[in-house]
Amino acid sequence: MKRAEVLLTCDRTLMSNYHGNEFVGFGTCAPPNFIPEWFYSFLFFPPIKTSKGMPVAAPYGLRKVEAQLLKEGFSVVTVTPDHIKEHVNDAKIIGIHTMDPFGLGPASTTLAAMLKKEPYLAKYFQALLSSTAIKEAKKKGAKLIVGGPGAWQFQYRPRFVEENGIDCVVEGEAENIIGKLFRAVLNGEDMPRYYEASVKEAPSLGEVPDIVGPSINGLIEIGRGCCRGCEFCNVTLRPLRWYPYEKILREMSVNKAGGVNMCCLHAEDVMLYGSRNTVPDDAKLTRLHELVMKNCNSISWSHCSLAAVASNPKLFSRLSEIIRQKQAWWGAEIGIETGSPAIAKKIMPAKAHPFKAEEWPDVVKSGMGILHDNMMVPACTLIVGLPEEREEDVLKTMELVDDLKGCRSLIVPLFFVPLGRLKSRDWFRKAEMNKLHKQLLCQCAEHDFYWLDNLIDLAFAGKWYVRFLREFYRVFAGIAKQKTRQVEVDVLQ
């Protein structure tokens, strides 16, 4: 059994491959519901396979921390939450990766408000921190450090931090500071309760280590930062960097050696790989996909922008041809956010670039049509309750959703969460919803139900080993439709 001074882990909802489909992972944002918890967890976040308590794949962010600490000479072990006890005896530091620890993210907040329960991802994070293994390690003097994309939420839960003995919360890109913090702990030095890595501390391309263990579903970062500057987003505060092909292929080889033969290209806008502005680079993007497809069995994207797609339909079609040599479809998360040109101009003026912000609804319709024709299935987000939103803005968004009824997609409305340059603004809460907001939520639900059976067929086509799951998802979808329509009646009254 591997002993180490640093133990890394995360909660049960993050240590899963979601049956090889990232879309399925969105089920962790929902609260407990009409499906028994044991069966719901099997459907939406089955436990990752392990070898001696160590996961065969782990969240990419956790793998990056692991790689950086190993690079700096620490002894490190990454384990699943169910196997902490076997590995924790020698650990002086327990590092926990978080995504949405309190369910304060947009999707979780919206579902929790509508269903009036705490989401699974928050429930399992809190179960991890209250576990016997963690508490016993703390009694023996182990220090508890948390980080990851969900680190910002701890600022809103100071009492939780105190009561659960969290010694340090690390927010931001940590490569250049994590070793110093961990070394200080081992030397018995004081450390801050909260540490937010500044832009100056962000690593250069050469300072970001390659992962040394496989990432869940083959997720590979191809770049960091974003040039669009939307006011509601944290990522725009980071410098834009694109990784060279060689680095991406090296990390793919790590995944492949560990038995992970799929690849999810991760960036805030995959369509802008290699570009220094909002115009796609045809040559670099095409070459990237040719290289990646030679080295994996399937590909997906984490995010892309509709403006980049609409600005170069021929390039997108070419990428679709490359990708669909081995698969029928692929997916990505895409931010629509609003159908109002006025709101687009105020808080996300560059999101439509190289088009004008006033053209945003037309950009969305054009981009979504191109995605549909090329078998890209987007999970789209809308933001409900944006600052300075008026009734006419909500009506514009409703008109846009209606125009998208023929586009194969999921459209998910999310309550506004104060992040980025808008972090000083107030949260949007269910009590603030007006009649139009409620109608918009119901409209999105009906859009999603219309496409759900088709998406289930696509998601599990050709996968004999999960074919039986398709029928369970169909049953779940059918019951969810009935339950949601009951909620719709209550909401609209």
Predicted regions and their residues:
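A solvent-exposed, charged loop/short amphipathic helix patch at secondary-structure junctions
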Residues: N21-K52, P101-L128, I347-K356, M433-E446
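N-terminal pre-triad scaffold of radical SAM enzymes
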Residues: R3-L14, K200-T236, Y245, L249-A257, ...
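Flexible glycine/acidic-rich beta-alpha junction loops that bind and position SAM and/or redox cofactors
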Residues: I94, F102-P106, C264-N277, A310, ...
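Radical SAM enzyme core and accessory elements
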Residues: K2-P32, P36-W38, F74-T78, C226, ...
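Short, charged N-terminal beta->alpha structural module
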Residues: F44-E72
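Glycine-rich beta-alpha loop elements in corrinoid/cobalamin-binding modules
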Residues: G61, V77-V208
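Conserved SAM/AdoMet-binding glycine-rich loop
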Residues: L8, S253-P378, V384-E389
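Catalytic cores of alpha/beta
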Residues: Q155-N164, L315-L319, P387-D403
